[in-house]
Each structure stands twice: as structure tokens, then as C-alpha cells.
């Protein structure tokens, strides 16, 4: 069918339609044979008929035809086919490349056999299987994204060191000495009274409890950092086969060490916030006010 439609176009390419000539106004009484350089297949019967006379010097057939075909949306297929016969060199590219055509306006395809041009074919064209598959994939992706758990917000400070010289440390002993770093920069502070190992999670839990109670705009200083890895082996394992894998990080704290400090609030608010932070720690502590 496609070859047949193209053969019809080739056969009628050199023929002239009276409808096209009727679009051109008569400008002078010159005979039609003067157009022989544009239309070499014109016959003598056409020159003696009642077609209006005009000269080729005052008319641009390409421009005239384009002005008459500015709006192609309302044309039917029969009219479009007739316009192809009138001036194929102009209308062929226009009809094939009209916006709204998915596969191109090729003669013999289902789009060209439709009763309207491609600008309106988009509204009534068939639903392809590919579009259905794409919709299914989008639904599956959306359902997967909904099931994903929400990511936890990162804390303002790092809980563990980013890089260490050695991956595993010796366990060591808990010293009973007194800390020499007991200075305070702010008004209120929390001081330890016994040696302990404070994990990174406990340090972060105490800091968050203080910041929530004192409100925004005020800072809480943390004087300790969990820099020692603690290894743990699974239960009921035999002797040997190396040291266990690092399980958590701790900060070694001696008596008299300052853990948190803050300022800019009243004593009542500071005491309440620090008491909540002290309940998160595994060691005995006391509330300090600097003079």
C-alpha cells in the first residue's frame, strides 16, 4: 500500500491542478504559456481555457502556496493528498515533518490514512504496549521508594575518628589517678567523680539532651572524644584465631575530668539540662559552677 501511494505521487508530480492556479490573482493579460519554464508539461488546451492570465515576474508560486497552507490542522487526508499533487517539493517536507507525528507522515501508514492530520492524530492515536510498560515500571519504582526507610540525620559532631594509625588497641587497665585537665571556660560544667569508659553513643546522647533543654542559639562544649576501639569476640568461641573485631569506641575518663560545659542560661535551666545529660553516663558526676 505504501509503494502504491508513493507511485501515485510520482505520477502526479508533473501535473498542474486548476485549483492551485485559481489561488493566484490575475495581474496582467499575459498568456499562460509564459509559465512554461516553471511548468514544462502544460498543454495547449490549458492556455486556451478560462484560466486567469498572469506573468511569472510578479508572482512567487512558492511563497503563495506557503501562505495558503499556513494552517494544516484542519485539512483532511484528501485535501492533504491534493496539496501534495499541487506542489510536492514544498508540501512533502511539510506533511512529513508536521509537529505531533510520532512516526512521521509517510504515505500509506495508519496516520496518513486517518481523517485528520498529525497535529490532531496525537489525541486519538492508539496506546502502545511500550507506554504501558513504562507506566508499570514507574509504579514499581514509586512503590520501592516508599518502602525504603528514612535516613537518619547525621549528628553535628563525629562520634568516632575517621582514620587511626592502628585498627585495634590493647584493652589496658582502668587507671585510678586524677585528671589534670579540669579547667572550665564557661559558667556551668559536668565533672566526673570516678574512672570509667564512656562510649560514643553515650556522649552523643548526653549532648543532645542538653541542647534540647537549653534551646536554640546556645552551644554545648564536649571535652571528651571516643578514640579507643574496643574489640569483642562472639560468645562460645574457642581460644586462638586472632583478636576480635572492633565493636564500639570509648573515651577513657579519670576522676575530675570535665565532660560538658555551657553558659548563657540561668542556673536553674543549666542544672536541669546537665542532670538529664548525667543520667545518660555510666559514671558518677557532679554539677560545677565557676566563679
Curated annotation (Swiss-Prot):
| Bias (Basic residues) | 163-173
Matching entries from InterPro entries are given as: PyrdxlP-dep_Trfase_small, Ribosomal_uL16, Ribosomal_uL16_bact-type, Ribosomal_uL16_CS, Ribosomal_uL16_dom, Ribosomal_uL16_sf
The cellular location(s) given in this protein's UniProt record come to: Mitochondrion
Kindly indicate whether the keyword RNA-binding belongs to this entry. Answer: no
In the database record, which residues form the transit peptide?
1-27
Keywords tagged on the record: Mitochondrion, Ribonucleoprotein, Ribosomal protein, Transit peptide
Q: Does the keyword Mitochondrion apply?
A: yes
Please indicate which superkingdom the organism of origin belongs to.
Eukaryota
Give the record's GO CC terms: mitochondrion; ribonucleoprotein complex; ribosome
> Region Disordered: which residues?
127-173
Annotated GO MF terms: rRNA binding; structural constituent of ribosome
GO process terms (BP): translation
Main subcellular location: mitochondrion
Q: Where is the composition biased (Basic and acidic residues)?
A: 127-137
What is the documented function of this protein? Answer: Could be a component of the large subunit of mitochondrial ribosome.
Stored PANTHER family: 50S/60S RIBOSOMAL PROTEIN L16 (PTHR12220), LARGE RIBOSOMAL SUBUNIT PROTEIN UL16M (PTHR12220:SF13)
Q: Which family does it belong to?
A: Belongs to the universal ribosomal protein uL16 family.
The name this protein carries in UniProt is Putative ribosomal protein uL16-like, mitochondrial
Amino acid at each position: 500500500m505504501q509503494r502504491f501511494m508513493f507511485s501515485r505521487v510520482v505520477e502526479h508530480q508533473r501535473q498542474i491542478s486548476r485549483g492551485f492556479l485559481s489561488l493566484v490573482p490575475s495581474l496582467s493579460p499575459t498568456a499562460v504559456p509564459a509559465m512554461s519554464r516553471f511548468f514544462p508539461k502544460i498543454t495547449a488546451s490549458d492556455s486556451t481555457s478560462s484560466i486567469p492570465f498572469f506573468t511569472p515576474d510578479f508572482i512567487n508560486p512558492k511563497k503563495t502556496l506557503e501562505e495558503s497552507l499556513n494552517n494544516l490542522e484542519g485539512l483532511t487526508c484528501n485535501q492533504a493528498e491534493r496539496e501534495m499533487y499541487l506542489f510536492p517539493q514544498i508540501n512533502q517536507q511539510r506533511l512529513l515533518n508536521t509537529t505531533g507525528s510520532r512516526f512521521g507522515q509517510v504515505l500509506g501508514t495508519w496516520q496518513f490514512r486517518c481523517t485528520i492530520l498529525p497535529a490532531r492524530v496525537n489525541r486519538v492515536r492508539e496506546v502502545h504496549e511500550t507506554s504501558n510498560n513504562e507506566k508499570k515500571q514507574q509504579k514499581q519504582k514509586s512503590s520501592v521508594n516508599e518502602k525504603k526507610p528514612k535516613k537518619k540525620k547525621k549528628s553535628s559532631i563525629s562520634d568516632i575518628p575517621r582514620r587511626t594509625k592502628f585498627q585495634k588497641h590493647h584493652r589496658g587497665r582502668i587507671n585510678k589517678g586524677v585528671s589534670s585537665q579540669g579547667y572550665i571556660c564557661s559558667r556551668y560544667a559536668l565533672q566526673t567523680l570516678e574512672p570509667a569508659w564512656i562510649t560514643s553513643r553515650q556522649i552523643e546522647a548526653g549532648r543532645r539532651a542538653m541542647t534540647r533543654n537549653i534551646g536554640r542559639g546556645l552551644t554545648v562544649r564536649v571535652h571528651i572524644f571516643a578514640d579507643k576501639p574496643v574489640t569483642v569476640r562472639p560468645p562460645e568461641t574457642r581460644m586462638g584465631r586472632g583478636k576480635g573485631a572492633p565493636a564500639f569506641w570509648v573515651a577513657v575518663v579519670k576522676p575530675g575530668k570535665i565532660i560538658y560545659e555551657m553558659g548563657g542560661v540561668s542556673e536553674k535551666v543549666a542544672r536541669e539540662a546537665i542532670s538529664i545529660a548525667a543520667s545518660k553516663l555510666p559514671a558518677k558526676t557532679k554539677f560545677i559552677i565557676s566563679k
